[in-house]
Amino acid sequence: MTAILERRESESLWGRFCNWITSTENRLYIGWFGVLMIPTLLTATSVFIIAFIAAPPVDIDGIREPVSGSLLYGNNIISGAIIPTSAAIGLHFYPIWEAASVDEWLYNGGPYELIVLHFLLGVACYMGREWELSFRLGMRPWIAVAYSAPVAAATAVFLIYPIGQGSFSDGMPLGISGTFNFMIVFQAEHNILMHPFHMLGVAGVFGGSLFSAMHGSLVTSSLIRETTENESANEGYRFGQEEETYNIVAAHGYFGRLIFQYASFNNSRSLHFFLAAWPVVGIWFTALGISTMAFNLNGFNFNQSVVDSQGRVINTWADIINRANLGMEVMHERNAHNFPLDLAAVEAPSTNG
């Protein structure tokens, strides 16, 4: 009888824990995805802060030339970064216990792998937590779908690209200047600016900014007057009020006359779907582009595509970009390569004897 009572008490304790985890009454919703999200993001954040401040230089290229990334080793906020794991490690899983010592682990850039893998797990769980909370509240699932765009982009540069290139040393450094270096080298090696999926991503980000500014300014300009000239217009809104706070008919009429009638949405729901979908689809395509270029399916090559009647090349902007790419390629990892890959790939002339 005693054993039965103890088991019921145990089940009751577990039940209370489950109810607390999945309760929508908590100040911050936890959820089952949150059970994994919280420790992974805390780990990634803690190690990032410590490494950004104090990590020793990392042998990123595997040629015994360490690169400094932390503040205590001479960097500032702009130049500092978490240096990617060494090319000597490649794609190997490299936790602390796989190294002979902590010094070796730090020298080979172990913190980068630790941060990136925990971060990707954490943001994926954050996306799942968004879906989970929406489900509990009876909402539609599109918040998590929208968040999948930045998750896909982060996964592309931190995981898919290193897998395709064969080493975590090719992943994006965790810092401002390191990100710029990643972008420059990516252009040099993959001609990303000439990739149509990147172009769609640019249209998504810039177009999303434009549409967001247009929508915000239209709404702000067509607010229903509820205040005097001496009060802030924001005081005319009360949280939870039933009536509209702006005149969508006036906004529609203004924009329809500014451009043309059918350029203006007359349905608030379809308008907001468009505002969400445009940048999300664009960033999806960019992530897809990074993931294809990871395996060297690169941007368009229009080099020397225009010639005159004598066969002489007439340079286009594609040729100017190609010249810039070659310049960037010979300058990066100067001591790791004797020639840029494009030049080194040419077969040597055959010799007799």
UniProtKB/Swiss-Prot annotation:
What enzyme class is recorded for this protein?
A: oxidoreductase
Q: Which amino acid positions bind chlorophyll a PD1, per UniProt?
A: 198
- Keyword Manganese annotated: yes
Residue intervals passing through the bilayer: 29-46, 118-133, 142-156, 197-218, 274-288
Q: How does it sit in the membrane?
A: Multi-pass membrane protein
GO MF annotation list: chlorophyll binding; electron transporter, transferring electrons within the cyclic electron transport pathway of photosynthesis activity; iron ion binding; metal ion binding; mRNA binding; oxidoreductase activity, acting on diphenols and related substances as donors, oxygen as acceptor; oxygen evolving activity
Which UniProt keyword terms apply here?
Acetylation, Calcium, Chlorophyll, Chloroplast, Chromophore, Electron transport, Herbicide resistance, Iron, Magnesium, Manganese, Membrane, Metal-binding, Oxidoreductase, Phosphoprotein, Photosynthesis, Photosystem II, Plastid, Thylakoid, Transmembrane, Transmembrane helix, Transport
Phosphothreonine PTM positions read: 2
Residue positions, PTM N-acetylthreonine: 2
* GO biological process, alphabetically ordered: photosynthetic electron transport in photosystem II; response to herbicide
Q: Which residues bind chlorophyll a ChlzD1?
A: 118
Binding site residues for pheophytin a: 126
Question: Per the record, GO CC terms?
Answer: chloroplast; chloroplast thylakoid; chloroplast thylakoid membrane; photosystem II; plastid; thylakoid
Query: Where do the annotations place Fe cation binding?
Result: 215, 272
Q: Which residues bind a quinone?
A: 215, 264-265
Where found in the cell? Plastid, Chloroplast thylakoid membrane
**Broad class of where this protein is predominantly found:** plastid
Which positions does the site annotation Stabilizes free radical intermediate cover? 190
Q: How does it assemble?
A: PSII is composed of 1 copy each of membrane proteins PsbA, PsbB, PsbC, PsbD, PsbE, PsbF, PsbH, PsbI, PsbJ, PsbK, PsbL, PsbM, PsbT, PsbX, PsbY, PsbZ, Psb30/Ycf12, at least 3 peripheral proteins of the oxygen-evolving complex and a large number of cofactors. It forms dimeric complexes. Interacts with PAM68. The nascent chain still attached to the ribosome interacts with FFC/ cpSRP54, but not with CAO/cpSRP43 or SecA.
Mention any additional remark: 2 of the reaction center chlorophylls (ChlD1 and ChlD2) are entirely coordinated by water. Herbicides such as atrazine, BNT, diuron or ioxynil bind in the Q(B) binding site and block subsequent electron transfer.
Protein's job: Photosystem II (PSII) is a light-driven water:plastoquinone oxidoreductase that uses light energy to abstract electrons from H(2)O, generating O(2) and a proton gradient subsequently used for ATP formation. It consists of a core antenna complex that captures photons, and an electron transfer chain that converts photonic excitation into a charge separation. The D1/D2 (PsbA/PsbD) reaction center heterodimer binds P680, the primary electron donor of PSII as well as several subsequent electron acceptors.
Q: Which family does it belong to?
A: Belongs to the reaction center PufL/M/PsbA/D family.
What name appears for this protein in its UniProt entry?
Photosystem II protein D1
Query: What does UniProt list as this organism's lineage?
Result: Eukaryota, Viridiplantae, Streptophyta, Embryophyta, Tracheophyta
Q: Which gene encodes it?
A: psbA
